[in-house]
Amino acid sequence: MMNNNGNQVSNLSNALRQVNIGNRNSNTTTDQSNINFEFPSGVNSNNSVQNSNNGRNGTQNNNNENSIKDTIEQHRQQQQAFSDMSHVEYSRITKFFQEQPLEGYTLFSHRSAPNGFKVAIVLSELGFHYNTIFLDFNLGEHRAPEFVSVNPNARVPALIDHNMDNLSIWESGAILLHLVNKYYKETGNPLLWSDDLADQSQINAWLFFQTSGHAPMIGQALHFRYFHSQKIASAVERYTDEVRRVYGVVEMALAERREALVMELDTENAAAYSAGTTPMSQSRFFDYPVWLVGDKLTIADLAFVPWNNVVDRIGINVKIEFPEVYKWTKHMMRRPAVIKALRGE
């Protein structure tokens, strides 16, 4: 699809405009909507990972406010509509489990679930053949007994590896580790991973940091800002501050990687950078990509991508406050596999 500027927009962004993800049947931790991804230039004006548009007038702000009000009203209406928990229709899921594919992967996700798109990104980067089933929470498909047998937590994402006797894996971090380790075992190439135990430990550390500290804090900040039944300013402030703290950790790590890279590559100016007589930002290597672990992209980096594009809705401008995080995310957002996954293709 196309946005008003004629740029392509992902299926994820389209779904987030239409689907309320704050209702009690939702099993994502995002609790917000109206997030647009634009390609290939990056992320659109609703996101913090974007090019600044200082000429924007009040119309855009009013549209954003109206969008939030509409989403909150949807939340209220759907809570009413689903007070009757007998409203469950999951024949589509039952049929799938009766006729499962013989090979490849099946990803269970939701069109507004960042963690589901996190898995899709890695599947796409590794070149694995997979099919995505976007569950309909309104029909209660996530409560289908067959799906609960795959994920006892009845949440997304979940993955079935049909090449391993329909092995089911749940929790996004566990899924990513399964995929990169399987690829490494089958090909001998540690793509998005490492053959070095020390690097593997660091990748695991950042991955666990993302799944336990980054995503949940953003989800809570969004919940208390837009969907909690009472306005609790201290909760909004507490979770927003924690998100900033988390991004500060990532920013510092990337900045250290940036300094090391520039000093290694720009040897003719290294002394001037060390002495402080020339800003390191003037180096021709200053915008080169840097990664959290080693000198290549891994799942430690990619796990952050879908979540990095919602933080503007809690009042955090990544480009201004965390410039290294901004550049890092833009480098990943330009990758064809990431674009494909975020479009839901």
Swiss-Prot record:
**Species name for this entry?**
Saccharomyces bayanus
InterPro entries hit by this protein: Glutathione-S-Trfase_C-like (IPR010987), Glutathione-S-Trfase_C_sf (IPR036282), Glutathione_S-Trfase (IPR040079), Glutathione_S-Trfase_N (IPR004045), GST_C (IPR004046), Thioredoxin-like_sf (IPR036249), Ure2 (IPR017298)
Task: Write down what this protein is called.
Answer: Protein URE2
Q: Where is the composition biased (Polar residues)?
A: 22-36
Q: Which GO terms describe its biological process?
A: nitrate assimilation; regulation of nitrogen utilization
GO molecular function of the protein, one example? Answer: transcription corepressor activity
Cysteines joined through disulfide linkages:
none
**Name of the encoding gene:** URE2
Indicate, by first and last residue, each region the UniProt record lists as having compositional bias (Low complexity): 41-66
Q: Name the job this protein performs.
A: Plays an important role in the cellular response to the nitrogen source. URE2 gene plays a major part in the repression of GLN1 and GDH2 genes by glutamine, and is required for the inactivation of glutamine synthetase. URE2 gene product may catalytically inactivate GLN3 in response to an increase in the intracellular concentration of glutamine.
GST C-terminal domain residues are: 196-345
Q: Which UniProt keywords apply?
A: Nitrate assimilation
Stored PROSITE patterns: GST_CTER, GST_NTER
Question: How does the annotation summarize its subunit structure?
Answer: Homodimer.
Residue ranges for the region (Disordered) are: 22-66
